[in-house]
Design a protein with these regions (language model features):
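Sequence/structural signature of beta-propeller domains
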Residues: 1-160
Length: 160
């Protein structure tokens, strides 16, 4: 799947009334080989005080023999700036997309001697540090410790 998926983000008022919609364009996937299981998408969005969003993109690739499986995660800061109407087609090249800036990227995997694969699916803000940096807390989903391989992981990232 060499496609940069386009997603529709919906904003809401304080009373949960649907407001503006914005188009978010994901990065192209890094997996290039056939897979037994595959998933990619935005698994978490966290709003920031300035109106921008932290967006967690993740790609989960499992090859037929499981060895070489990986989860590639990226956190972007994205700015909703050009709303679209709910009936607007979002696949056209001229459709405005949100600006985004890469803040962090990491990869977990299953190797011959290392099994640290983690499918991060939750994200929230942690404390703000004395220097103004922001802690982001992430949590993975082990699917009930699937195949005795996946584990529950917590990860913290400091954004300067």
């Amino acid at each position: 799947n060499p496609i940069e998926n386009r997603l529709r983000f919906q904003s809401f008022s304080d009373s949960l009334k649907a407001m503006e919609q914005y188009v978010y364009k994901m990065d192209k996937p890094i997996a290039r080989k056939p897979s037994k299981y595959y998933a990619m998408g935005v698994s978490a969005i966290t709003p920031l005080a300035d109106g921008s969003l932290l967006v967690l993109e993740r790609e989960f690739y499992v090859p037929p023999m499981f060895m070489g499986s990986f989860v590639n995660c990226k956190i972007y800061q994205a700015w909703p700036s050009m709303p679209i109407t709910h009936d607007k087609e979002i696949t056209a090249d001229e459709t405005p997309v949100m600006d985004k800036f890469l803040l962090a990227e990491w990869k977990t995997n299953i190797g011959l001697f290392k099994r640290n694969i983690a499918n991060y699916e939750g994200m929230c803000l942690g404390p703000q540090l004395a220097d103004g940096s922001q802690v982001v807390v992430l949590v993975s989903d082990s699917q009930g410790q699937y195949a005795n391989t996946l584990k529950d992981w917590f990860k913290t990232i400091v954004i300067k």
